[in-house]
């Protein structure tokens, strides 16, 4: 049998190859089906009572944006979701002396907040919260700490807004 090539027929390698192909098909199918969606929200923060015309005593106005069941497409509520970014647009209180603004993210149904300082009357994108869980019950609040100003109640110039971008 010199120079002859002998092929051994075995079903074991074929089974492993078939399992590998099946796993790849499932993986590729999951990757292809991943979709990205957005949930836009908008709300005007409330008027703030100004207790003094100085920068030592602040009042707080805020807008709260909660994610609810109806924000998700039908049939996807139970699907795992990953937050991609939070786009934001913050208003300001034009009659105040000074204003500090922060954007805070809360995981689903949690009262703990993870906050980032932002500027009044500005917009931007944050991807700092991507490692945290996201879904029904997640929340963003934009807080406006308003210092001094006239008249007794200072009102915002407009509305705050956020867009939750996520994939599933």
Specify the residue positions occupied by each region the protein language model found:
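Short conserved micro-motifs at the rims of enzyme active sites and ligand-binding pockets
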Residues: 1-3, 153
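Bacterial N-terminal signal peptides
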Residues: 17-27
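Sec/Tat signal peptide C-region and signal peptidase I cleavage site
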Residues: 28-34
């Amino acid at each position: 049998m010199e120079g002859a090539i002998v092929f051994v027929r075995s079903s074991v390698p074929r089974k492993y190859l078939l399992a590998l192909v099946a796993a790849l098909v499932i993986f590729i199918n999951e990757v292809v089906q991943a979709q990205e969606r957005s949930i836009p929200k908008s709300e005007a923060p409330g008027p703030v009572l100004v207790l003094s015309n100085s920068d030592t005593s602040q009042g707080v106005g805020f807008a709260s944006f909660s994610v609810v069941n109806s924000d998700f497409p039908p049939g996807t509520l139970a699907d795992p979701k990953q937050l991609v970014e939070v786009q934001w647009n913050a208003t300001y209180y034009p009659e105040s002396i000074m204003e500090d603004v922060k954007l805070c993210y809360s995981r689903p149904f949690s009262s703990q907040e993870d906050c980032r300082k932002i500027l009044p009357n500005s917009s931007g994108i944050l991807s700092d919260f991507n490692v945290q869980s996201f879904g029904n019950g997640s929340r963003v609040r934009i807080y406006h700490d308003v210092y001094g100003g006239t008249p007794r109640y200072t009102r915002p110039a407009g509305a705050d807004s956020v867009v939750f971008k996520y994939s599933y």
